[in-house]
Structures are given as C-alpha cells and as structure tokens.
C-alpha cells in the first residue's frame, strides 16, 4: 500500500502542483509576454513526463516510461542564456515580484525548488531516474531567467535586495 505521505507520492505530487502553477501562469500572460505561452506549454508536457517517470519505481513491471533530459535540458539552457543576455545584468539578489507574470514565474521557481527537494528525499530512499532531477534543477533556473525576462517585456524593473552584496558576476 502506498500512502499519500510516501516520498514517491510527495515527489510526483509536487511536480503536479508545479504543472498546475505553470498553467495558471500561462493564463496571466499579457500581450507583451504572450511569446512565453508555447514554451510554458512545452514545460507542462515535460513536467507530465517527469511525473510519469517518478510515479512508478524503475524495477516495477508497470514502469512504462523513462524521462530523458538531454534535449529538454539543452533547450532550457538555451532559453536561460537568451533571456539572461536580453535583460540588464544584475550583481545582487533581486526581490521576487514585478509584473503579475514575473511574480507567478518566481512562485514557479520556488515551487520547482521544493519539488527538487522532494525528489532528493525520494532518491535517498530508492533509486530514481537522475534525468528527472537534472531537468528539475535547471528548470528552476529557467523560471528565474523567465521571470526577469517577463519583467523586461512588461517594462518592470527588478528590485534589488538592499542588503545584498555582489553575488553574480
């Protein structure tokens, strides 16, 4: 019997919550940020793939799907690079916020980090597909870059954390 508190259920449940949040974020897109819609939909598809992979142990005969991260992660990294090169450089921490879309993307970022922690907890108990963890790790960085890009598109400036030292180079 698998309880709702089982680390496996927690891990794919966090992925499901994240997927719902990405869908909500898509509903907030403005005319300026509408260009993010297709990639956010693709991320939702990939999150379903990750959840599918996590839902059944690899050694279980019902495990019918394995997520492979190489191409999706390379795609995310290309988006991260593009958005980072487009927006003004920052050396300090920024406060999550700005436009509605950027704020929602920051929530997606922190939800992704929570999902990553749940996946690590599952990994400490049993073997998992490392490709899922790699993709989820890069996805949180994508959401940070996309949030900054959304603020840029909506002509909102990032707000620097006033007590931050230079942390980005």
Residue ranges: model-predicted function:
Residues 1-169:
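Phosphate/pyrophosphate-binding loop motifs in nucleotide- or prenyl diphosphate-using proteins
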């Amino acid at each position: 019997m698998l309880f709702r508190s089982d680390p496996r259920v927690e891990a794919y449940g966090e992925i499901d919550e994240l997927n719902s949040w990405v869908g909500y974020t898509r509903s907030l897109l403005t005319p300026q940020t509408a260009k993010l819609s297709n990639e956010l939909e693709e991320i939702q598809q990939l999150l379903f793939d990750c959840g599918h992979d996590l839902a059944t142990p690899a050694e279980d005969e019902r495990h019918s799907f394995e997520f492979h991260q190489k191409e999706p992660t390379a795609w995310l990294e290309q988006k991260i690079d593009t958005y980072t090169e487009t927006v003004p450089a920052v050396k300090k921490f920024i406060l999550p916020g700005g436009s509605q879309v950027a704020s929602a993307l920051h929530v997606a970022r922190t939800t992704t980090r929570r999902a990553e922690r749940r996946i690590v907890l599952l990994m400490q108990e049993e073997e998992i597909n490392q490709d899922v963890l790699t993709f989820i790790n890069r996805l949180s960085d994508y959401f940070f870059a996309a949030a900054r890009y959304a603020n840029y598109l909506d002509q909102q400036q990032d707000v620097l954390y006033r007590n931050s030292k230079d942390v980005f180079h």
